[in-house]
Amino acid sequence: SIVLRGKAPFR
């Protein structure tokens, strides 16, 4: 999963 700019981890 990739964390977008310190937000919730999205895949």
UniProtKB/Swiss-Prot annotation:
Main location: secreted
Summary of the tissues where the protein is detected: Expressed by the venom gland.
Top-level taxon of origin: Eukaryota
Record's function text: Inhibits angiotensin-converting enzyme (ACE) with a Ki of 1.2 uM, targets B1 bradykinin receptors (BDKRB1), and potentiates the smooth muscle contraction elicited by bradykinin. In vivo, induces hyperalgesic effects in living rats after intraplantar injection.
Annotated family: Belongs to the bradykinin-related peptide family.
Entry keywords, A to Z: Bradykinin receptor impairing toxin, G-protein coupled receptor impairing toxin, Secreted, Toxin
Any GO molecular function: toxin activity
Organism: Cyphononyx dorsalis
Protein name: Fulvonin
Subcellular location: Secreted
General remark: Is hydrolyzed by angiotensin-converting enzyme (ACE) by only 7.5% (compared to bradykinin).
A GO cellular component annotation in the UniProt record: extracellular region
